[in-house]
Amino acid sequence: RWWRSERFTGVVIPAEGEFAIITPYFEEPSVRESMAFGDDVRTWNEHEDPFALVAGVLKDHGLQRGKIAVEETVRHFIVDGIQQAVPEFDVVSGKPITRGCRMLKTPAEIALMQMANDVTMAAYRHVHANIDKGMLPADISAMMNQATRQLGGRPGFSMALLNDASAYPHGT
């Protein structure tokens, strides 16, 4: 699992040719472990500019100008860093590309989504049948997490709200 960080890790995917992953030096082992294919991993240290590596990948592919599409939720400091490193390129939203990729699902992806849904619904049924008077929200959340694990899932989060709190899931 990868989470957002103040340190840039990204993948440069040219229209033609092999992709390259850019990541902090200390992340290289876990990046390589998660790769199913490809082998171009370029690392940077704390005192180095990771966006210079983006420029290097583009140069290595013989690209001198054009558009760089960036996934729409990428944070500004990354977009700005790329634009500063390669001002001859236009950094644009990749939403038209990424949206299409996310909307289309293979049968295997649909099967995985169904399996996750089945685990979640079975965990809900277990929790519903086992809630007792006097239980605290933390007790209910723990029961949901435990049921999810016992069914082979990995709980991402669970939130149980009771009484007035259930009307204000994001606070007041």
Please report, for each region that a protein language model flagged, where it lies by residue.
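Structural signal for well-ordered, non-membrane alpha-helices
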Residues: 121-128, 145
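C-terminal helix-coil-helix/basic helical segment that borders enzyme active sites and/or dimer interfaces
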Residues: 128-135
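Active-site pocket-lining segments that scaffold enzyme catalytic pockets across diverse folds
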Residues: 117-124, 137
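A composition/biophysics-driven feature that prefers long, compositionally simple stretches
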Residues: 1-119
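Short catalytic-site patches enriched in acidic/histidine residues
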Residues: 1-5, 95-100, 104-107, 135-172
